[in-house]
A protein has these predicted regions:
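N-terminal amphipathic/basic-hydrophobic helices that include classical n-h-c signal peptides
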Residues: 1-8
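Active-site catalytic microenvironments in core metabolic enzymes, especially phosphate/sugar-handling
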Residues: 9-239
């Protein structure tokens, strides 16, 4: 999914400084650099946004004559091969050839209280009183519905059937969630006594851990739970 927005002309470094400050990016210890990852033309007007900087999204940005691409998943992850070969070479070559700036924001775009993936997901799922749990990336809020109703709401929002673990008629009042691949954060939901935890992915051991702790678990898709932050940030930048 892509989103294209028009803006008043702005310098690429000025835009980076603004987004860094708006997302409080310097306060996050992350798995990748946040900010301008690939430098393109100095002046930016047309921004295309999406979840991940794959070839399809880059090609879309080229087709739409974008000056910048704004994503949640960019390049240069910790532990990845550092050489520019294969698909990584192809992606970066396409950006450089077309003078497109690549901005990527990972954890800062999950956590932001307005445009962040978690807040944006809460708004779409009609979760009441959404708030972060301490200094974790997990959020909590209230719903008043059965597990099957919560799962249906997730499916309506993401347009895909989630994996649901738990009794479908169980009542859900306190819900915890974290977008993306946050199944290991289930412990934070258990600690606050949540009735259900929603994230993007599920690992082999998670259903048993959830069942033994009497908490429902919904895996709604990594990409599906993170479609909203970059789009909301791009929309904010129109102001």
């Amino acid at each position: 999914l892509t989103n294209s927005t028009q803006h008043k002309m702005i310098n690429n470094k000025t835009l980076e400084q603004y987004i860094n400050q708006y997302l409080n990016a310097a306060n996050f210890s992350d798995y990748c650099p946040n900010g301008l990852q690939v430098e393109g033309k100095a002046e930016i007007c047309n921004i295309v946004s999406g979840v991940s900087a794959n070839q399809a999204l880059i090609d879309q940005a080229i087709d739409e004559k974008a000056d910048a691409l704004l994503v949640h998943h960019g390049f240069f992850w910790k532990g990845e091969d550092q050489v520019l070969t294969g698909i990584k070479k192809n992606r970066i070559k396409a950006l450089l050839k077309n003078d497109i700036n690549l901005y990527a924001y990972h954890l800062p775009l999950d956590a932001h209280p307005v445009v962040g993936n978690n807040m944006q997901l809460a708004m779409r799922l009609n979760i009441q009183n959404p708030t972060p749990i301490g200094d974790t990336l997990v959020w909590r809020g209230e719903v008043n519905a059965s597990l099957s109703e919560v799962a249906q709401s997730v499916m309506n929002v993401t347009a895909r059937a989630p994996q649901v673990f738990g009794k479908k008629h169980a009542q859900v009042q306190t819900v915890a969630w974290c977008s993306g691949g946050a199944q290991s954060y289930l412990k934070h939901a258990i600690d606050i006594g949540a009735d259900c935890f929603i994230t993007g992915e599920v690992s082999e051991q998670i259903p048993a851990i959830a069942k033994e702790n009497n908490i429902a678990f919904i895996a709604a898709g990594h990409h599906a739970t993170e479609r909203y932050g970059a789009k909301a940030l791009a929309k904010h930048l129109e102001c």
